[in-house]
From Swiss-Prot:
<comment type="similarity">
    <text>Belongs to the antenna complex alpha subunit family.</text>
</comment>
<dbReference type="InterPro" id="IPR000066">
    <property type="entry name" value="Antenna_a/b"/>
</dbReference>
<keyword id="KW-1003">Cell membrane</keyword>
<dbReference type="GO" id="GO:0005886">
    <property type="term" value="C:plasma membrane"/>
</dbReference>
<keyword id="KW-0148">Chlorophyll</keyword>
<keyword id="KW-0997">Cell inner membrane</keyword>
<dbReference type="InterPro" id="IPR002361">
    <property type="entry name" value="Antenna_alpha_CS"/>
</dbReference>
<dbReference type="Pfam" id="PF00556">
    <property type="entry name" value="LHC"/>
</dbReference>
<dbReference type="GO" id="GO:0045156">
    <property type="term" value="F:electron transporter, transferring electrons within the cyclic electron transport pathway of photosynthesis activity"/>
</dbReference>
<keyword id="KW-0479">Metal-binding</keyword>
<feature type="transmembrane region" description="Helical">
    <location>
        <begin position="13"/>
        <end position="33"/>
    </location>
</feature>
<keyword id="KW-0460">Magnesium</keyword>
<dbReference type="InterPro" id="IPR018332">
    <property type="entry name" value="Antenna_alpha"/>
</dbReference>
<dbReference type="GO" id="GO:0019866">
    <property type="term" value="C:organelle inner membrane"/>
</dbReference>
<feature type="modified residue" description="N-formylmethionine">
    <location>
        <position position="1"/>
    </location>
</feature>
<protein>
    <recommendedName>
        <fullName>Light-harvesting protein B-870 alpha chain</fullName>
    </recommendedName>
</protein>
<feature type="propeptide">
    <location>
        <begin position="53"/>
        <end position="62"/>
    </location>
</feature>
Length: 62
């Protein structure tokens, strides 16, 4: 493992890794924001629920 750090500068490698992870996190968040289900800024679109009222038939007609 120590030979790897002789090939690469540790400071540059860590800065590069942090930059890559930050860009990846931004990309994932923007992809989620572009979907309707996971867009937490605008909220989920609430569609009106369709209900049907059924009146029970009365078999005991007088």
């Amino acid at each position: 493992m120590w030979r790897i750090w002789q090939l690469f500068d540790p400071r540059q490698a860590l800065v590069g890794l942090a930059t890559f992870l930050f860009v990846l996190a931004l990309l994932i968040h923007f992809i989620l924001l572009s979907t309707e289900r996971f867009n937490w800024l605008e909220g989920a679109s609430t569609k009106p629920v369709q209900t049907s009222m059924v009146m029970p038939s009365s078999d005991l007609a007088v």
